[in-house]
Amino acid sequence: MAPIHYLLPIITLGSAALARQDAFEAKCHSFANKIHLPNVHVNFASYVPGGTNLTLADNPSSCGATSQSVSADVCRVAMAVATSNSSEITLEAWFPRNYTGRFLSTGNGGLSGCIQYYDMAYTTGFGFATVGANNGHNGTSGEPFYHHPEVLEDFAYRSIHTGVVIGKKLTKMFYEEGFNKSYYLGCSTGGRQGFKSVQKYPNDFDGVVAGAPAFNFANLISWSAHFYPITGPPGSDTYLSPAMWKVAHDEIIRQCDQIDGAKDGIIEDPSLCNPIMETIICKPGASSDNCLSAAQAKTVREVLYPLYGVNGTLLYPRMQPGSEVLAAPIMYNGQPFAYSTDWYRYVVYNDPNWNGTTFDVQDAAAALAQNPYNIQTWDADLTPFRKSGGKVLTYHGLQDQLISSENSKLYYARVAETMGMPPEELDEFYRFFQISGMGHCGGGDGAYGIGNGLATYSGKDPENNVLMAMVQWVEKGIAPETVRGAKFANGPGSTVEYSRKHCRYPRRNVFKGPGNYTDENAWECVV
């Protein structure tokens, strides 16, 4: 046994650590009584030890989560914040014990009023003081917008900004040192919210990571609605079952896979892929298991075509080829897209009986003309954000089944044209990365593990993590030249089969060799 005098430092250190933990826990429990901010009603402040599987008893059932695993010790503060006389947001702020001096806001998805607890757990694990809100309503339906313009305004922009303002004040109250830098992390609707902050509140964040952004929002809603008139319902001549979409997908891959130089089942640049679906029209008398009818081939061709408005103006670019299998059960399932139907029912027409099967381009014109609270999020002059010193890193999966990656390219072009800046100048503050083999915000057939959330985590180093790459860009001035993605053998947390460095737009990946396509150094970013 060691002499007692050798054990004393260990005991002292252990006691000090325990005291710090006790002090943190006590600070958390007393924090609610110290919050006296206008329009803020604190529901509770509770200490959550790392390793807890946190029960989310009040989370709306449609949000799909009854619990959340939390890795770090955090102080969880839940509150309601009034945004008008008839609206409020539910806001949570999580303060980690391993605080790194960084503030972060998470975003939302779809039309939803769901706090993304998985993002809050993810970012507090990195030491960010993190806020998340319900976007001004509960659940995934658009019905709360019906005759409630204040709720709609929260959804369009106000929820995120309110959460940031309150969250920063609370962070300064909870930590004596306040915070040094402010960040944002979101995808889909969360991506749109990130760009809305860049456009409308250029001083809210030092660094914004915005994935698969749902900007050009009104036209995105219409684009999502326009697939049903193309496919028709199950049983119609124009409808393809998921199995038939797999047949179409395999033919598209056959025609386009090797454009990038590698036969790996991944299309590196879908803009170069213009499949000819007549090649698999069934011959007379042939089995239809591995070919399409003429009507079905036309459906595939029309699905891969942009949406134009009543006067021939481009509303929304085409769905990128390569996403067919992922999109089939959601966008091409023979039913009107639920989010689009809700938007037209409860926002555009204020008519709960509007039928999504009747959609046409006149409806698209009505939605775009309305554009409540500039929810389009399509402003292209980012000069104030640039002058503030802010950085925005956006990414988009090239197998995205819900929001076409072509739309992110279109916005990039709009910014370049509006600001009169070529890519090398935009790179100073705005970088866009196309992620081959990534579906909507994650998943897919390729190297989608870029660290934009728990479901894509493959390491915390900036080289393997898009959030920490943003931190490095903001705090050290080292901008990411590529975004490395991991191809998992069997989903997140499993063995990494290979990695690939995804290129900064407008560059694209080309296989040069030598070696196998699984070697990230066998690829080159070219313009």
Swiss-Prot record:
Q: Which residues are glycosylated?
A: 53, 85, 98, 138, 180, 311, 355, 516
Record's signal peptide: 1-19
Q: List the disulfide bonds.
A: 28-75, 63-114, 187-441, 256-273, 282-291, 503-525
Of the GO CC terms on this record, one is: extracellular region
Active-site residues are: 188, 400, 440
By its UniProt entry, which InterPro entries does this protein fall under?
AB_hydrolase_fold, Tannase/feruloyl_esterase
The catalytic activity of this protein is classed by the Enzyme Commission as: 3.1.1.73
Give the Gene Ontology MF terms in alphabetical order.
Answer: feruloyl esterase activity; metal ion binding
GO process annotations (BP): xylan catabolic process
Q: Where in the cell does this protein reside?
A: Secreted
Whether Signal counts among this entry's keywords is yes
Return the broad EC class: hydrolase
Per UniProt, where does Ca(2+) bind?
Answer: 257, 260, 262, 264, 266
What keywords is this UniProt entry annotated with? Calcium, Carbohydrate metabolism, Disulfide bond, Glycoprotein, Hydrolase, Metal-binding, Polysaccharide degradation, Secreted, Serine esterase, Signal, Xylan degradation
Q: What Pfam family is a match, any one?
A: Tannase
Task: Give the family, as the similarity comment puts it.
Answer: Belongs to the tannase family.
Q: Main role?
A: Involved in degradation of plant cell walls. Hydrolyzes the feruloyl-arabinose ester bond in arabinoxylans as well as the feruloyl-galactose and feruloyl-arabinose ester bonds in pectin.
Q: What is this protein called?
A: Probable feruloyl esterase B-2
Protein source organism:
Aspergillus terreus (strain NIH 2624 / FGSC A1156)
